[in-house]
């Protein structure tokens, strides 16, 4: 372990909390230096921290806000196998995505990722060409899965299903002249922000210092001024290498980086509005050959309907907002496949994220490469940008490889390909965990420990499938420092404003109980 654990005696070395943050801030402020400073607490940054810490390097990660504050919490929550990239001829990223999906589902995070069926209904407007294109794509996805060595017991093969079976999977699908459906399987995360937190905690268990509400200023390749955004105190941290993993804010740390962000928007619906589907209704976008709108069954009885791809020029906001045009587009597209059309009254909330795409020239943002890049600037800051949530581990590996070479660091080989995250276990082990299914899906083998927090730990919060013990665990183990962290990133209650309002008193109580 690169650094000794700084938690209390006998404490969980992966636990992140306010006391640990204060202790580690004080230690660093006394003038120590580290091998690697990581700026950015999204999926890429925490991935870099974990990779470096498990190679034996001393690591500090800082984020001005919170873990998963930016794009990492606004995804479709898919561990995507890369089928779209295959359709556009990008075989390399397609295979990389399939391999990384398999690693998540079978080794590193099987507790957080499940196989999700996607259903494309065969409706009167589905042409023979359209059907053939989808079927060919799904078969290609089967080949991708096989070449990535993900077993069919984890991700079943694609298949055609009858009209009656299609209605069982998606009860709201249009019934008139339904000619069956085509189904394929992909990986679905219980939540993207939860994956980020789990990676951060795993990094912490290997000695990485994870400091949120800490900004990095006057950044060079060997140092940065760190500021505690809660107190205003500052100090200079020296590091042998610095990695910029700030996503859509990367050019603020390294002005030589040129990004062209695109906005991806989702709507949040009540699962009842689609008859509580167990498959993701997948609707081709008219006029497009390899783009779809997905109605994704999600936790807490919700549906995430997305996604758009719109240019987002100008200043980068902390929290992007969906446009009216995007809301209308998503509703209009999914309604082509529904028996009863959705309206704006069915929309409980929206969320939008900005993709940190490298600017490679003209064309629409939908056509820009999703490849990641690792760039070393004139000031020796190493920036990792682009890519996809699914491929975070490989992005991190490439960034740390670059940092090791640039800084002449004495580091071991990458270990993250086979390293389980906190709570991870095989499906057979997870099935034996004595806790409600929702808790096991979010916490894996830690679910029993979560339940043990408080006498009324299983009491529901705001009438949702979230219990009071989860709020307590977020404060004691997951680095939540305020109610926004609890409601907007650790639990995702905040995606629906009315749910957030009802849960606010419970969230405030979780901090008073510390």
Can you describe what each PLM-predicted range is?
Residues 244-256:
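Flavin (primarily FAD) binding-site architecture
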Residues 1-36, 51-54:
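Extreme N-terminal leader/targeting segments of oxidoreductases
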Residues 29-44, 60:
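Beta1/beta-strand and adjacent pyrophosphate-binding region of the FAD-binding site
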Residues 77-169, 292:
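Dinucleotide-binding Rossmann-like beta1-alpha1 core, especially the glycine-rich loop
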Residues 32-34, 231-241:
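Core beta-strand elements of the Rossmann-like FAD/NAD(P) dinucleotide-binding domain
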Residues 212-224:
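A conserved short coil-to-beta-strand element within the FAD-binding core of flavoproteins
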């Amino acid at each position: 372990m690169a650094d000794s654990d700084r938690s209390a005696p006998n404490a969980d070395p992966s636990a992140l909390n306010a006391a640990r943050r204060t202790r580690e801030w004080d230690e660093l402020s006394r003038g120590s230096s580290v091998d690697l400073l990581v700026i950015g607490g999204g999926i890429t940054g925490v991935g870099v921290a974990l990779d470096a810490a498990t190679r034996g390097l001393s690591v500090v990660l800082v984020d001005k806000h919170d873990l998963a504050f930016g794009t990492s919490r606004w995804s479709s929550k898919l561990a995507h196998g890369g089928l779209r990239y295959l359709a556009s001829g990008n075989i390399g990223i397609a295979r990389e995505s399939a391999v990384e999906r398999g690693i998540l589902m079978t080794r590193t995070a099987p507790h957080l990722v499940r196989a999700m069926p996607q259903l494309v209904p065969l409706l009167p407007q589905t042409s023979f060409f359209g059907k053939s294109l989808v079927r060919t794509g799904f078969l290609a996805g089967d080949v991708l899965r096989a070449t990535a060595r993900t077993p069919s017991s984890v991700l079943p093969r694609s298949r055609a299903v009858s009209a009656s079976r299609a209605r069982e999977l998606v009860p709201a699908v249009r019934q008139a002249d339904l000619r069956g459906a085509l189904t394929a399987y992909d990986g679905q995360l219980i939540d993207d922000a939860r994956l980020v937190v789990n990676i951060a905690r795993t990094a912490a268990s290997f000695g990485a210092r994870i400091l949120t509400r800490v900004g990095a200023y006057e950044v060079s390749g060997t140092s940065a001024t760190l500021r505690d955004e809660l107190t205003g105190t500052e100090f200079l941290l020296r590091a042998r290498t610095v990695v910029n993993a700030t996503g859509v804010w990367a050019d603020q740390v390294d002005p030589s980086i040129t990004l062209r962000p695109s906005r991806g928007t989702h709507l949040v619906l009540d699962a009842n509005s689609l008859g509580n589907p167990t498959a993701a209704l997948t609707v081709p976008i008219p006029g497009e050959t390899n783009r779809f709108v997905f109605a994704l069954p999600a936790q807490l009885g919700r549906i995430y309907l997305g996604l758009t791809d719109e240019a987002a020029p100008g200043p980068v906001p902390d929290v992007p907002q969906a446009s009216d045009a995007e809301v209308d587009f998503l509703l209009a597209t999914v309604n082509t496949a529904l028996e009863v059309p959705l309206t704006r009254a069915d929309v409980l909330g929206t969320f939008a994220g900005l993709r940190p795409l490298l600017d490679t020239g003209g064309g629409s943002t939908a056509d820009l490469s999703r490849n990641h890049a690792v760039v070393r600037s004139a000031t020796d800051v190493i920036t990792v940008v682009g890519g996809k949530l699914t491929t975070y581990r490989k992005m991190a590996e490439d960034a740390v490889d670059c940092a090791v070479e640039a800084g002449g660091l004495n580091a071991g080989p990458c270990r993250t390909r086979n390293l389980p995250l906190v709570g991870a276990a095989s499906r057979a082990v997870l099935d034996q965990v004595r806790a409600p299914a929702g808790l096991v899906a979010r916490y894996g083998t830690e679910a029993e420990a979560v339940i043990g927090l408080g006498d009324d730990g299983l009491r529901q919060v705001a009438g949702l499938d979230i219990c009071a013990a989860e709020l307590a665990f977020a404060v004691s183990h997951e680095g939540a420092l305020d109610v926004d962290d609890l409601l907007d990133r650790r639990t995702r209650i905040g995606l629906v404003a009315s749910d957030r309002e009802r849960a606010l008193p419970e969230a405030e109580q979780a901090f008073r109980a510390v």
